[in-house]
Regions:
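Divalent-metal-activated hydrolytic enzyme cores
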Residues: 2-39, 74-76, 86-91, 106-203
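Conserved beta-strand-loop surface patch within small alpha/beta domains used
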Residues: 28-82
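Ordered, amphipathic secondary-structure segments that act as subunit-interaction surfaces
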Residues: 91-104
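Metabolite-binding pocket within alpha/beta catalytic cores that recognizes anionic/polar moieties
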Residues: 85-86, 98
Length: 203
């Protein structure tokens, strides 16, 4: 879990590192500026924002290959579906993946825990064997009670739930297959969720 950094020092270090990396990237950018807007391989991935996951590596992507939509948990939220609909309707993707992962942070809390932590303080919380704890510094907000945080109880069930939500959405055509997988953080392997892929097959 994150430590309590002194923001001004931490962010300036990160900012410098990012800008330095970008300069290196620019120097080796080559002809990427000529890439077409639609993804060349015509598929999209919905996956988690977890920093341990690199879809470009685990799915063999280069710039311009595919759309990668990321949020906490890789959940089929309204905004994720908005992006998927744009992905096919305007940019031509024809196959979609829902990829959750093992040891996901979204399994460590629920809506009540999150809203209570936010009501206590807006500072970063910590977790130990006894659960989540707030530092209780500064003010909190009760606005978290009005958000569905889309937490996860069990990965197989959550992948199936998200595939079904996508397939049943009125803006999603029936001829787009949706594949359900779990990324194994300890090995890098993609493990199929057969019931999810079956639910996501072309009608």
């Amino acid at each position: 879990m994150p430590n309590n950094y002194k923001n001004e020092n931490f962010m300036s270090k990160i900012l410098n590192e990012v800008l330095s990396a970008n300069r290196d990237y620019v120097n080796n950018f080559g002809d990427k500026g000529e890439l077409a807007l639609p993804p060349a391989r015509q598929f999209a991935i919905l996956t988690c924002m977890d920093a341990r996951l690199d879809p470009a590596k685990y799915a063999g992507l280069s710039e311009g290959d595919a759309h990668v939509i990321r949020n906490a948990g890789g959940r089929a939220s309204d905004d994720a579906i908005r992006s998927l609909v744009i992905s096919y309707k305007l940019l031509g993707t024809r196959e979609w993946f829902v990829i959750h992962h093992t040891n996901c942070g979204m399994e460590l809390f629920n809506n009540e825990i999150m809203s209570d932590l936010l009501a206590s303080s807006l500072k970063t919380a910590s977790i130990d064997e006894n659960g989540w704890h707030d530092c209780c510094e500064g003010h909190g907000s009760t606005e978290g009670r009005y958000i569905n945080w889309l937490t996860i109880k069990e990965q197989t069930a959550s992948v199936l739930e998200d595939v079904l939500r996508i397939k049943n959405h009125p803006l999603v055509p029936s001829d787009i297959p949706v594949y359900g997988y779990i990324y194994e953080c300890t090995t890098g392997r993609l493990i199929e969720v057969p019931e999810a892929t079956a639910a996501g097959k072309v009608a």
